[in-house]
Amino acid sequence: MPMTTSTPARGRRVALLACTALATAVATVAGAPGAARAQAQPPAPTGGAARPRQQPPAPGTPKELRLPTKRVLTLDNGMHVVLVPFGTVPRAYVQLAVRTGMIDEARDGTGLSQLTATMLDQGTATRDARRIADEAATMGGSVSASAGADVTNISGEVLTEHAAPFVTLVADLTRNPSFPADQFARVRTDAIRRRAIAMSQPGEIARERFRAVMYGDHPYARLYASEAELQAYTPERVRAFHAANFGARRATLYVVGQFDAAAVERAAREAFASWSAGSAPTVNPPKAKNARSLTLLDRPGAVQSTINLGVPVPDPSSADYTALEVTDALLGGSFGSRITSNIREQKGYTYSPFSQVSTRVRDAYWAETADVTTDKTGASLTEIFGEVDRLRREAPSAQELRGIQNYVAGIFTLRNGSRGGVASQLQFLDVHGLPDSYLTGYVGRVMATSPEDVRRIAESYLAPERMTLVVVGDKKTVEAQVAPFARTTP
């Protein structure tokens, strides 16, 4: 389903857990595998004939998204402003998206994009960190910044009457950061601490190595800087990254919710019109690894093995992308999926396996992740690859597919139900160069996906012999189990 750039595994897991109720309800109605089919029945009357068994109502037909009317402005310096009236709650969501992130990091600059983003609200030429936080709080909100693979977002949500001044505040943070040395030292220390925590978690260790194997020397391969690299960074290094990669040609301002459009437009023009255009966004698609490899990382004494396996797939510009998302949901990307039903519900090898399609600009991969019992590592891989192979050979039933289609369409609807969700979806279109019809026709494409489409997608793109496989676990226990998966014959 449409998203912005890729989310970490933990975020995906939280999203899946949040949607459990919806997935179960949809699967139950539509007969998806793994669904709880038992219905609570009222007690029979003490006398006379029993009441007829109650049945849930038939599922409704998912409806297409009606994209809110938007107004798009282009300033003389190339910056875009997108104004979207939405909802009735008197709040406005403001998001400035700048097309920079990991993609612009040099080999000796891993993590600079996130350090730069974190420093944006730590002080400007006219505001210190305390004043920035206080101003945002006075407007009924807060401001934050984060960097991803291709986009850095500066965003916040405020009361309707403060939308225009909040735009002015966001402009100051983006255009005039001062990168104060005392705040930088604290932010860098926090980054070192977060890195240490991440490198103690097998899921992050596996994800980092998976990306490194998949992308080689490309910036997308480098998720974490070393502690030595982080220690060596200075405010001057971050300032140079900002100067090179922040500019109007790379920026789009999204304002979604209830707001005074004339006041917001005026504020945007006043705050951003004099911003230098800067360079065009970097577009550098990777040459992702497309052949089987196995990496085993030793974690002595571990009672679980963490599995990451995946393969390059078409990006959102492909005509097959929506069907690929449906295929992912059926195979491993939902709680009613085949892999989850197999290794979680039936076998009990794991608690929370999941798969996803992860996207960047002109790039995507499909990946399955699972933390499995150590002595069932090989058996888990056998089952995962077995489910992939089964779907490549045999189309799912129409009934099974319909449950998944309803799930995917339902999640899509939920994602478009908030101000931030609408902004993220519009950003997704812009980052991937897609028309509005991509969103307004999404549900129709989901529901039009046929069982044979799913089988064809799996056969075409999810070939086990092309998959990158990373396992983090107790080598003495796991090595012999995973050895047969090092190579495979098509």
Regions found by a protein language model. Give the residues of each.
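M16/insulysin-pitrilysin zinc metalloprotease superfamily fold
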Residues: 122-126, 156-188, 334, 354, ...
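Mature N-terminal segment immediately following signal peptide/propeptide cleavage
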Residues: 59-97
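M16/MPP (pitrilysin/insulinase) zinc-metallopeptidase core fold and M16-derived inactive scaffolds
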Residues: 93-160, 200, 222-224, 334-349, ...
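An aromatic/glycine/proline-enriched structural segment found at the starts
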Residues: 42-58, 217, 252-315, 471-490
